[in-house]
Amino acid sequence: MKNLINYFIIPTILSFAFAFEIPDAIGYNGVVVCSKKEAAQIGIDILKKGGNAIDASVGVAFALAVTHPSAGNIGGGGFAMIRLANGDVTSFDFRETAPSLAYENMFLDSLNNVIPGKSKYTSWAAGVPGSVHGLGTIHKKFGSLPWDVLVYPSVNLARFGFELDLHNIIILNSERYKKLLANDIVSKKIFTKDVDYKIGDLLIQKDLSLTLERIAKYGYKEFYEGKTSDYIIECMNRTGGLISRNDLRNYKSVEREPITFSYRGYTIHSMPPPSSGGITLASIL
């Protein structure tokens, strides 16, 4: 592989404990590690087509947007730590940014008390998404396969569905998430049903497949300037969110110099701020 990458999307913290049997994994010439087998398989297939680690990471990230959106999604943001074959190390910050209309006390009432849930469960809590821009940026700079080759497998995964596993059904069947998903007319239509989900049920996400298809066909900027951006603005207008069209058009990923430190003779490279990971690791070690 020409490039090596560690790719991170900040996950939603879930208050569940899972006990899974972890199978042995053996690979040659490349390894793909993620939380869903469907996403891992897409990454493996990309490597077999001659793609590098960046290509595989992009494909896996879009697949996780279908199968495990709290670990990778097109509506959030993330970081990428990249080490090239020549030893060069760099990082990319594509975390969400605050909308231009955001202000200091937006989650407080007139008495300066926190408004419960407003900073978590409303459109006011939504930052300008960075995931698609970040994935497009690292692919443009380091990828080898065409963009659509990396994204289209996830189009099909959303269109034809994937089988739910234990992790999926625990979340979808929980009263907390049932309530949250039912609060919006779009997510209610897609995810809520009269009976609980079962392991092996097929989850089809037609609208997501259409969005991913546009991104695959027209490139990552479609998300910020094309029809997908129209849908985002429509959602903001419908739910009272703050993200504007200019916020989307002006979003930029940022390449940053990694934090570098030593531990027991090893050189460690990690993500700089706004990630807290690198600083925390350097402080602990």
Predicted regions and their residues:
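Bacterial N-terminal signal peptides
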Residues: 6-15
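N-terminal secretory signal peptides that target proteins for export/translocation
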Residues: 1-2
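Noncatalytic scaffold domains of N-terminal-nucleophile
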Residues: 20-41, 45, 53-218, 223-225, ...
